[in-house]
Amino acid sequence: MKKILEKYIPEWLELSLITFLYTISNIWLLLNRGMYWDDQTWLTLLKLNKWQTFWITLEQQKQYAQYYVMKFLALSGDVFLATRVLAFLCWLISAFAIYLIMKRVFKIETLTAFLVTTLFALSPLFFERVISSIVLYSLSTALFFLGALIYWLVANSGRWYIRWSGIAISAVFFFISFFTNSFLVFFYGFVLLAIFHDRSLLTHWRTKLLWMLLLPILFWTIKETGGDPYGLTANYNQFVIGQPGWVSKMIADLWSGIYCGLIWPLTVPWALLERKIFAIVFIIALACSWLATRLVAGSGKSEDSIGYKAYLWWGVVIFAFGLIPYVLVGKSPHPHAFQMRHAMLLPIGASLIYWGLLALIVKEKYRAFVVSVICALFITWSIYNYFTLDMDWYKQRAIIARLQEQSVQLTTRPTLIVFYDEIRRFGWMNRPLTLSDHFGNITEALGTTTTVGIPVEEEQSVKDIYALREWMTGDPTPKNMPNVIHLSIVSKSGQRDLVTVKNWLQVKKVELFGTEEEYKKTIDDTFDIHLVPRRLSEKSKWDIEVEKEYK
C-alpha cells in the first residue's frame, strides 16, 4: 500500500499529517448542531418546508447559488450535518491544493511547503465556516484552489487535449467560485502569480492570458443581466467610494483588516493559557504539531531556493487581493458578531507573510518549532471557539424550552417579546442574541411566526422589524396591536461559573448519544436558565412605539 501511495501520491505523508492536525483542530465542527446568525432564518424556513418563501428571500438578494446549494444539501435529510461535513471537507481540500501547488508547481522545499500549508489549514480567521447559511463560501474556496491546482498542472502539458481540457475544467471551477463575489477580485491575484510563474503568458497573451482577464468580467456581465437586488437588501454590498466620509472609512477598514488578519490571531489565544484546561490543550497540540513537523523533516530535506522576500512579497499581494473586495463595500473583518467572515480570503496571504517574517528574523533551525507553537495556539483557539459556540447554542435551547412552557400565553394574540440578556457570558465572544436568533428560537418553540422576539438593544423600529419578518417569512404585519412582553434571560445558579469545559462535555455527550428528552433535561439541570418577567418603572421605547404605530 505504501509503495502504491508513493508512486501515485508521493506527498501522502505530508497530506496525512495536514489532515491529522486539521482534524484535531476542527473535529468539533462536525459535532456542532447549533444555529447561528442567518441560520436561524434560513434553516427555520427549511424546517417549516417554506421553500417558496426561502426562494423569494434569496431571489431578492440575487443569491441563486445559495438557494440551490441548500436545496441539494437538504436531500441528505440532515442539512446541519451536511453543511458541516461540506465545510470541513472544503477547507481540507483547499489545504491539499495549496500544498500540491507549492510542491509540484513552485518546487518549494517539502518542510517549508508543509509549514505554510499547515498555517493555512489551522488558521482561525474564518471561523464562521460553522454557519450553515454561508457554506457556499467554503465551497467557493475549495473550487477556487482546485481550479488553480488543475490549471498549473496542465498549463504546460505537451498534449494539447490534456492542456485545454484541464484549462476548461479549471475555468469552470473558477467561474462557480465567483458566486462568492469576493473571488472576482481575488482571482486577479492568481492571474498575477500565474504571470510571475510563466512569463510566456505575456508574450502569448491572446491564447494564454486573455481568458483569465475576461472570465470575471463575463461572470459579472451575466450576473448583472439578472437585475439588481431589491427589497430590504437593495443597498447591501454597495461600494463606499463616493459616499460621505469614504476615505476615512476605507482607511479604518484597511487597518481593521490588517490587524485582525495578521496580529489578532497571534495575540488573542495567549489569554486562554491562563485556564488550566486550555493550557493542557495547548501542550498536547504543541506536541502533535512538533511531532508532525519532525516526521516531515525526517522524510527528506532539500534547500529552499526561494528567499524570504518572495514569501513576503507574494504574501502581501495575495493578502491585499483578499482584503480589498471587502474594504470596497465597507465590510472590514473584526472578531465580533460573526464579522470575521469578511476575512475568508486572508489565511493564505497571512500564512505566506508569517513564513516570510520567520525566514527573515528567526534562525533556520528554530523556524519549525516557532511554527509549531503558532499552530498549537491556533488549535487551542479553535477548540475554545467550538466550546463557546456550543455553550451559545445550549443557552438558546434552554430559551426554547422556557418559551414552550409559556406557549398558551404567547400565541393567543400577536406578541412582541423584548428580551433582556443577562447571561451574555454563555454567548460566543460574549455576544447577545440577535433578532435572527430570537426569530428562530421562537418559531422552534411555538411553531408560529406571529410572535416576534427582539433584543432590547435592537436599533430598528417596530415597523421595520415587522417588515423584515414579512420579508423573511411572508407573514403580513399584524392588524391588531401586539401585546408587548418584557422577559429577562437569567440563570438561577447564583454566582457559579457554568461556562466550563466540564459542563460542555457533559451536555455534548447527551446531545450526541442521548434522547431529546435527556438532552433538554441535562441542559436544564446544568445551566438552570429561565425567562423572568421584567418589571419596568415606566413604559419602554418598545411600548411607546407599538402604541404609536397602532393608534
Question: Which residue ranges define each predicted feature?
Answer:
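Membrane-interface alpha helices of multi-pass inner-membrane proteins
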Residues: 163-181
